UniProtKB/Swiss-Prot annotation:
InterPro entries (UniProt xref): DNA-bd_RFX, RFX-like, WH-like_DNA-bd_sf, WH_DNA-bd_sf
Alphabetical GO biological process terms: cerebellar cortex morphogenesis; cilium assembly; dorsal spinal cord development; forebrain development; midbrain development; negative regulation of smoothened signaling pathway; positive regulation of transcription by RNA polymerase II; regulation of protein processing
GO molecular function, one term: RNA polymerase II cis-regulatory region sequence-specific DNA binding
Inactivation phenotype: Mice with an insertion of a cardiac-specific epoxygenase transgene into an intron in the Rfx4 locus develop head swelling and rapid neurological decline in young adulthood, and have marked hydrocephalus of the lateral and third ventricles. Interruption of two alleles results in profound failure of dorsal midline brain structure formation and perinatal death. Interruption of a single allele prevents formation of the subcommissural organ, a structure important for cerebrospinal fluid flow through the aqueduct of Sylvius and results in congenital hydrocephalus.
Protein name per UniProt: Transcription factor RFX4
Tissue: Isoform 1: Brain-specific. Isoform 2: Testis-specific. Isoform 1: Highly expressed in the suprachiasmatic nucleus, the central pacemaker site of the circadian clock (at protein level).
Region named Disordered: 27-59, 501-538
Main subcellular localisation: nucleus
Any single Pfam family the record assigns to this protein: RFX_DNA_binding
UniProt-annotated stretches for the region Necessary for dimerization: 315-487
Keyword Magnesium included in the entry's annotation: no
Subunit structure as annotated in this protein's UniProt entry: Homodimer. Heterodimer with RFX2 and RFX3. Binds DNA. Interacts with GPS2.
Organism: Mus musculus (Mouse)
Statement: the UniProt record of this protein carries the keyword Nucleus: yes
Length: 735
């Protein structure tokens, strides 16, 4: 070795010389074994390497890391979450992302002092970057991945919050089985409808729905169109006559509600779960295309079947859009609630509210106001004050809302059957009036935290409507299922179920029922944290819905009698406007004329789909015996309010830009900005809700989804970019 080269080393010339020597050595070594195919592979690899290491890619990534992240002692970020941030950055800037290992080298180039730790329980631990935090000015900001989050956890000792900072991945639901569909033996079938054909159709339809669910979990949304087309246009000829039966149409509606509920729970298990923008866009695109796919698949099928399929699919699409909008509202509220400075100012403004005047105005608007209502308002005021004083996380506020609805609506309505709608209306009137008066009082007094309260008020109102609608839809599902099973003694009883929304049932003689008559809803407990008092569990509370319009979203055609028309030839409100063919008449359905155009190749194969029932089948409807006493609620999907009243689903309705700015008020003197130094929260990958774990058994409106082949799936892929990391799919959530 020449020592002259080491006295004054020239790094560029030395590295180029070493690289040239290595290349020559490799060429000499493999020159005799090089084939045409190998040369082609080498060229392809060289092109890929050149594309991955463009001159502008690494500098741009380093600049992006410098703008969005900083060194912070005591802060851990999951390696998968940071890589998902990087994939989102590459997609927005139209650059080719590198693999996870290469990205780790780029991170260490920007932050050399960064370390890696494996955190988590045994068998479920994940790698984390230790010593790096997200800047508050970053679009990926989350309080738990920032310096403030680390300081807040160390000071308060609430480390249980950090346990929930794992991003959700629909891939973790791979292998989910649908609950059992209705059993044909529990249905009241007309004599003209063969039981064997109905049972066969239910089996076929369950296989079809299970395939759709598995396809959605794998993020292959485009395959849903193929499954819909092949099932409905490949229907065996002997099954075509039963499709126009009102009983089969109702069965399809109930099964669709189960499927849509399962898909909604897989894509967005809770509105508090943080979702990236890429996943939100994929969900919205799927919701938009579903109706178009059904129009093609249901071509030339009976009109009543088409109507119920279209209606349920459109409502399901609205559900997905509503959930994404409410999810965004919750993430914006999370940023406000987790800021100590903002909550301190909110507490000060909250205690300056004229509670006595607001309470009097609220009671004046109520139909039957009593002293119990006044005590209830004061109690709720004190509970919210305690949450602000303790600087509780957003999960505690959601749990408080769950407890409030349970105490003021569920328990009160349980004392009197059929009074849920009246009790919910009474409580919703009081809740809305009180919240509006509080916002008005803060506006008149130019409260510095008015913007924060306005955002929290919007989120609270949406979530309360969400809970009340879920309760109402559960009650309507019970009534509909009783009608399908024929538990009503006469046709008039079944018609009364259909007309419930148009004509409310006549209450029994006596004073109107209200929350004031429940001692549990007005009794003021001793001072304690509202979080420490768990709300009693009840089935199907915190799922989905809103109590603005009391029309149930699953509208079915219910037979009043075997082949008998409605009395006086009047059309029922929830019935289809088109003529319904009699189930006793055998009719032919035209052959699908666009098979080649849409790529239809053959009939639907029902036998190739295995592992449908790894466990013995059990009746999923134990709460529906043949007697009139119903011991429990049915498990069906709740739905949401209309988009006309809460138009939060458009891209222009994002809350941060308009609320997170310091705007001048009518007050003549300078006022402190509403949300000082609070970044946007449009992308958050952490903090699933606490209450979802607590109410896991009671929130589902049907039997919880089971899992199959646990050993074959990795259920802890806690990030939506599983397709990029695992390499199991060609497209992913970040696409």
């Amino acid at each position: 070795m020449h020592c002259g080269l080491l006295e004054e080393p020239d790094m560029d010339s030395t590295e180029s010389w070493i690289e040239r020597c290595l290349n020559e050595s490799e060429n000499k070594r493999y020159s005799s074994h090089t084939s045409l195919g190998n040369v082609s592979n080498d060229e392809n690899e060289e092109k890929e390497n050149n594309r991955a290491s463009k001159p502008h890619s690494t500098p741009a990534t380093l600049q992006w890391l410098e703008e969005n992240y900083e060194i912070a002692e005591g802060v851990c970020i999951p390696r998968s979450a940071l890589y998902m941030h990087y994939l989102d950055f590459c997609e927005k800037n139209d650059t080719q992302p590198v693999n996870a290992a290469s990205f780790g080298k780029i991170i260490r180039q920007q932050f050399p002092q960064l370390t890696t730790r494996r955190l988590g329980t045994r068998g479920q631990s994940k790698y984390h970057y230790y010593g790096i935090a997200v800047k508050e000015s970053s679009q990926y900001y989350d309080v738990m991945y920032s310096k403030k989050g680390a300081a807040w956890v160390s000071e308060t000792g609430k480390r249980e919050v950090t346990k929930q900072t794992v991003a959700y991945s629909p891939r973790s639901k791979l292998g989910t089985l649908l609950p059992d569909f209705p059993n044909v033996k529990d249905l009241n079938l007309p004599a003209s409808l063969p039981e064997e054909k109905v049972s066969t159709f239910i089996m076929m339809y369950r296989t079809h729905c299970q395939r759709i669910l598995d396809t959605v979990i794998r993020a292959n949304f485009d395959e849903v169109q193929s499954f819909l087309l092949h099932f409905w246009q490949g229907m065996p000829p002997h099954m075509l006559p039963v499709l126009g039966s009102s009983t089969v149409v109702n069965i399809v509606g109930v099964c669709d509600s189960i499927l849509y509920k399962a898909i909604s729970g897989v894509l967005m298990p809770t509105v508090l779960q943080a979702l990236p923008d890429s996943l939100t866009q994929v969900i919205r695109k799927f919701a938009k295309q579903l109706d178009e796919w059904l129009k093609v698949a249901l071509h030339d099928l009976p009109e009543n079947l088409r109507n119920i399929k279209f209606e349920l699919s459109r409502r399901f699409s609205q559900i997905l859009r509503r959930q994404t909008s409410l999810n965004h509202l919750c993430q914006a509220s999370r940023t406000v609630i987790h800021s100590a400075d903002i909550t301190f100012q909110m507490l000060e403004d909250w205690r300056n509210v004229d509670l006595s005047s607001i309470t009097k105005q609220t009671l004046y608007t109520m139909e039957d106001s009593r002293d119990e209502h006044r005590r209830l308002i004061i109690q709720l005021y004190q509970e919210f004050d305690h949450l602000l004083e303790e600087q509780s996380p957003i999960e505690s506020y959601i749990e408080w809302l769950d407890t409030m609805v349970d105490r003021c609506v569920v328990k009160v309505a349980a004392k009197r059957q059929g009074s849920l709608k009246k009790v919910a209306q009474q409580f919703l009137l009081m809740w809305s009036c009180f919240g509006t008066r509080v916002i008005r009082d803060m506006t008149l007094h130019s409260a510095p935290s008015f913007g924060s309260f306005h955002l929290i008020h919007l989120m609270f109102d949406d979530y309360v409507l969400y809970l009340l609608e879920s309760l109402h839809c559960q009650e309507r599902a019970n009534e509909l299922m009783r009608a399908m099973k024929g538990e009503g003694s006469t046709a008039e009883a079944q018609e009364e179920i259909i007309l419930t929304e148009a004509t409310p049932p006549t209450p029994s003689p006596g004073p109107s029922f209200s929350p004031a008559k429940s001692a549990t809803s007005v009794e003021v407990p001793p001072p304690s944290s509202p979080v420490s008092n768990p709300s009693p569990e009840y089935t199907g509370l915190s799922t989905a819905g809103a109590m603005q319009s009391y029309t149930w979203s699953l509208t079915y055609t219910v037979t009043t009698a075997a082949g008998s028309p409605a009395e006086n030839s009047q059309q029922l409100p929830c019935m289809r406007s088109t003529h319904m063919p009699s189930s006793s008449v055998t009719h032919r359905i035209p052959v699908y004329s666009h098979r080649e155009e849409h790529g239809y190749t053959g009939s639907y194969n029902y036998g190739s789909y295995g592992n449908q029932h790894p466990h013995p089948l059990q009746n999923q409807y134990p709460a529906l015996p043949h007697d009139t006493a119903i011991s429990g609620p049915l498990h069906y999907s709740p739905y949401h309010r209309s988009s006309a009243q809460y138009p939060f689903n458009s891209p222009t309705s994002r809350m941060e830009p308009c609320l997170m700015s310091s705007t001048p008020r009518l007050h003549p003197t300078p006022v402190t900005p509403r949300w000082p130094e609070v970044p946007t929260a449009n992308a958050c990958y952490t903090s699933p809700s606490v209450h979802s774990t607590r109410y896991g058994n009671s929130s589902d409106m049907y039997t919880p989804l089971t899992t199959r082949r646990n050993s074959e799936y990795e259920h802890m892929q806690h990030f939506p970019g599983f397709a990029y990391i695992n390499g199991e799919a060609s497209t992913g959530w970040a696409k």
